[in-house]
Amino acid sequence: MIGAADLVAGLTGLGVTTVAGVPCSYLTPLINRVISDPATRYLTVTQEGEAAAVAAGAWLGGGLGCAITQNSGLGNMTNPLTSLLHPARIPAVVITTWRGRPGEKDEPQHHLMGRITGDLLDLCDMEWSLIPDTTDELHTAFAACRASLAHRELPYGFLLPQGVVADEPLNETAPRSATGQVVRYARPGRSAARPTRIAALERLLAELPRDAAVVSTTGKSSRELYTLDDRDQHFYMVGAMGSAATVGLGVALHTPRPVVVVDGDGSVLMRLGSLATVGAHAPGNLVHLVLDNGVHDSTGGQRTLSSAVDLPAVAAACGYRAVHACTSLDDLSDALATALATDGPTLVHLAIRPGSLDGLGRPKVTPAEVARRFRAFVTTPPAGTATPVHAGGVTAR
């Protein structure tokens, strides 16, 4: 049996700066140790896909992320692992438990996943190994992980059987509890016509500080942003719908720069729990811009459910420090100026009309190229500062 301290020391030795996940009884010693370890940040998330997205953001911000999960949660992780971390070639550590291990007694809901866990990691193109029960073998396992992360620049998996890690006491502080206030703009003389997404993005670029990092959601938002002005400060998500906010969270926790997430209503609704995650961990430098057109533009304009949801009120209830509900481009300018000058997280909601540019193209740079130039931008000290931006973990090539 190994100690949780040995496991955490191995992770920090790899350069892991953030661990995010959903608890499993097999993971209890590891989680309890990480919570009390000053060298590593632990983020509770609402579901396992968020953990993978936070890990991606951690690397993009200059660190190295570790996503932890019960193997039953690998299904939730599969989308960001295969459509974000793999095409963008983002290194990360994934620790999954082995419930339902063949030959061991367990609950019926774990039997199938227990049989296919290793195969699922293989299908996700992840090299992986068992977490052993001796410290000597653990050092060997971490050496293999380090080599894989550096050579393949892809996530590496550890499979944790039952009873490998000794018990560890929990020493957790009380969580932050807060709700924000919604500022609703309804000013006489301002146009009632909803702006287009391209006009909103043009206004964003006009207001955006040059030192700000931007994470844009998959689909037309990223394609239009790229068309308007392709910048090193932009990270265009090409997959992992619903994960922009938690990728942005991972970035924001690793840099003093302002981080702006450009999101859509369909994307936010797909992982609505991410609002609670952002609100709970409360990065002061995060601005979450939601462009709400009420439809899935990228797939033909089918309606989302945003007309039935007050997204600004939900964000306020989830702990965003400030929320702005905008109806015009001038509202957007005012809200962005306020958000960028005050502590967040701040959500800025703008109702826009459906539709996009005719003949809209796609980025000519690969996801891996976008990820590396973005990481280089984020980890370069902003002009006029002497404090280096944090960079840890696996060095980007």
Swiss-Prot record:
The keyword Nucleotidyltransferase is assigned to this record: no
Cofactor: thiamine diphosphate; Mg(2+)
GO MF annotation terms: magnesium ion binding; phosphonopyruvate decarboxylase activity; thiamine pyrophosphate binding
Gene Ontology annotations of biological process type: antibiotic biosynthetic process; organic phosphonate biosynthetic process
Phenotype upon loss of function: Disruption of the gene abolishes production of phosphinothricin tripeptide.
CDD domains to which the protein is assigned, alphabetical: TPP_PpyrDC (cd03371), TPP_PYR_POX_like (cd07035)
Catalyzed chemical reaction(s): 3-phosphonopyruvate + H(+) = phosphonoacetaldehyde + CO2
Keyword annotations: Antibiotic biosynthesis, Decarboxylase, Lyase, Magnesium, Thiamine pyrophosphate
UniProt-listed Enzyme Commission number(s): 4.1.1.82
Top-level enzyme category: lyase
Pfam families for this protein: TPP_enzyme_C (PF02775), TPP_enzyme_N (PF02776)
Pathway named in the protein's UniProt entry: Secondary metabolite biosynthesis; bialaphos biosynthesis
Keyword Transferase: no
Recorded coiled-coil stretches: none
Functional description taken from the UniProt entry: Involved in the biosynthesis of phosphinothricin tripeptide (PTT), also known as bialaphos (BA), a natural-product antibiotic and potent herbicide. Catalyzes the decarboxylation of phosphonopyruvate (PnPy) to generate phosphonoacetaldehyde (PnAA).
PANTHER family for this protein: SULFOPYRUVATE DECARBOXYLASE (PTHR42818:SF1), SULFOPYRUVATE DECARBOXYLASE SUBUNIT ALPHA (PTHR42818)
Family: Belongs to the TPP enzyme family.
Name recorded for this polypeptide: Phosphonopyruvate decarboxylase
